[in-house]
Design a protein with these regions (language model features):
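A structural signal for multi-pass alpha-helical bundles of membrane permease subunits
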Residues: 2-263, 267
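Single conserved hydrophobic/aromatic residue that forms the stacking wall/gate
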Residues: 266, 271-275
């Protein structure tokens, strides 16, 4: 009976894997087709590896500039996020003061607050301070919008770390800053890696806020650039270039997915947290 159940679970897992991976495979396959090949049979394998589609996508939709903007936004947003989230999570996990529980509860409640709910007032506020079409401002907005989830997640990781490590380091003369940087950060690396990867992928793929806050073509990010690819092609859609552009967008996300499990294997607790 257990054998039958095990095989049923395996078959279901294989089916779900095929369902989720096939669109990625189809997108990659279509990126190498000519327009005639795609219109003749969208599901057939490409006759040859047509790299001209990637060149066309890179040039027609100005993806080179958008790619650079997306890299800048993702890196700066993630850096700002970690700069604030790590100390805030540490304070909320380790110190008890008036209002600490209320602050934690507010952060947890804000997890359910989506960016689309505050998009109009946010647009008006940034317009009033000339904050539109400004990539650093967009990075700050991204980081702040991700605060609730990341603080809630990292606070849980830090709360689970035994206090003995910090007490030993304090006996050795460690300051509060040293406790954070040399004790808690190394011990909380799995949590930090988790929020870093999830946030970076979210920043890379974010569309609604970038669409509203970036109206200058030179400041737009990759997801907005793909919409531009539709615009420049009008009614004569170059399907190969379109799918090639989607592949370019997916590459950083796929790299993060591939290196994520490898990096997790090296995130172990150090035997001597404070040096």
């Amino acid at each position: 009976m257990k054998t039958v159940r095990t095989w049923c679970i395996r078959i279901l897992m294989i089916l779900f894997t095929i369902i989720f991976l096939y669109p990625l495979f189809w997108n990659l396959m279509s990126a190498f087709k000519t327009n005639a090949e795609y219109l003749t049979d969208p599901y057939a394998l490409p006759l040859s590896l047509n790299l001209d589609n990637f060149v066309a996508a890179w040039q027609k939709a100005n993806i080179a500039a958008y790619f650079g903007n997306s890299v800048f936004v993702t890196v700066l947003s993630t850096a700002l996020l970690l700069l604030f989230v790590i100390p805030i999570s540490y304070v909320l996990a380790r110190y008890r003061f008036a209002g600490s529980k209320l602050i934690s509860t507010i952060y947890m409640a804000c997890i359910f607050l989506q960016a689309t709910y505050i998009m109009i007032p946010l647009f008006l506020e940034l317009q009033a301070i000339n904050g539109l079409n400004n990539l650093p401002v967009l990075c700050l907005v991204y980081a702040v919008m991700q605060f609730p989830f990341c603080i809630f997640t990292l606070q849980g990781f830090m709360s689970a770390v035994p206090k003995d490590f910090e007490e030993s380091a304090r006996i050795d003369g460690a300051t509060n800053l040293q406790l954070l940087l040399k004790v808690m950060v190394p011990l909380a690396k799995p949590g930090i890696a988790t929020i870093t990867m999830l946030s970076a992928m979210g920043f890379w793929n974010e569309y609604p806020l970038a669409l509203v806050l970036l109206t200058d073509d030179a400041q737009k990010t990759l997801p907005i650039g793909m919409a531009n690819l539709f615009e420049v092609q009008k009614y004569a859609t170059d399907w190969g270039a379109l799918f090639a552009g989607l592949v370019i967008i997916m590459i950083p996300t796929m790299i993060i997915y591939l290196i994520g499990p490898v990096s997790y294997t090296h995130l172990t607790l150090p035997t001597t947290p404070y040096v």
